[in-house]
Amino acid sequence: MTIPATRLDQIANRFAELEARMASGTLEGEEFVQASRDYAELEPVAKVAAEVKAMREEIGGLEEMLADPEMKAMAQEELAAIREALPEKERQLAIAMLPKDSADNKPAMLEIRAGTGGDEAALFAGDLYRMYERFAGEQGWKVEPVSMNASEVGGFKEIVANVSGTGVFAKLKFESGVHRVQRVPETESGGRIHTSAATVAVLPEPDEVDVQIDDKDLKIDIYRASGAGGQHVNTTDSAVRITHLPTGIVVQQQDERSQHKNKAKAMQVLRTRLYDHLREQSQGEEAAARKAMVGSGDRSERIRTYNFPQGRVTDHRIGLTLHKLDEIIAGPGLGELVGALIAEDEAKRLAALSE
């Protein structure tokens, strides 16, 4: 994709303008915050745009040198090398210029729920949580559990955690969907392979200004927290259930002994789910953009299979199979899958632009 020279100049001028504003020392408050965001977003684009412009100018200079018999051989060699490298650099620029998802730099709410497969599904949900926890550690992110429903055999029936850091949602958003595991359970004496599943949802966490919640739209119920088998785990009414009446979204929280802490956590989850609901509505109005994404974005879509006997992980959306199951489930190896999904998404969006 060839970017016009006028567009390169526009990028350079806009970046120079932002640099001057940032250096002026006159920006304060929200104006400074917005300018900083604009600068951080434009900087990588401006860097690649400058490289493309320099390569094009160098091609022009080398073409003039072809008229000089003494310089012709050297100029031809350098010209061939730059002409070969330029299309890839222009592709990098086109990717850098793709419209950004406004949520990409937001923290995320990670929700993992055991699906079909009983105890084995709960154990797998635990494996997935630890995989994301270790991957997050490698990225320098922070993971804080918000609520959990542990299984009696280990793992989780459900766990919700907050993941914060740089570029969290951008890297984790393609993890939403049904993850399937094929392995022999430890309790299986006959050595038969069982298939079970867990559902992962990754939701961007909104800023306060992104979602406004009116108290009159909420129905709040307070009740006594209960544990496995229905026994009460607290002698006071500390569990909280919040229903958002306009959307019907219901959030329950009972992990903390304090009603106030449970309410605060429930509101955090509600705000995130409401923001996700609003994003889905707007994406529904932008069907073409959504169609260009990797996969359907539907959280009921089976996206990945982890086959333990064969030591392989297959991502069904991009047809990628990696025989690195141990490395992936341990956390560090997940980066290769994440990178492949991001690259495929960029390629699809580039193709959609050129149609």
UniProtKB/Swiss-Prot annotation:
Keywords carried by this UniProt record: Cytoplasm, Methylation, Protein biosynthesis
General function of this protein: Peptide chain release factor 1 directs the termination of translation in response to the peptide chain termination codons UAG and UAA.
Domain of life: Bacteria
Xref: SUPFAM superfamilies: Release factor
Molecular functions per Gene Ontology: translation release factor activity, codon specific
Pfam family, one: RF-1
Protein name according to UniProt: Peptide chain release factor 1
UniProt xrefs under SMART domains: PCRF
Family to which the UniProt record says this protein belongs: Belongs to the prokaryotic/mitochondrial release factor family.
Gene: prfA
InterPro entries: PCRF, Pep_chain_release_fac_I, Pep_chain_release_fac_I_sf, Prokaryotic/Mito_RF, RF-1
Locations listed in the record: Cytoplasm
Chain positions found as N5-methylglutamine: Q231
GO cellular component: a single term: cytoplasm
Maturation and modification: Methylated by PrmC. Methylation increases the termination efficiency of RF1.
UniProt entry tagged with the keyword Manganese: no
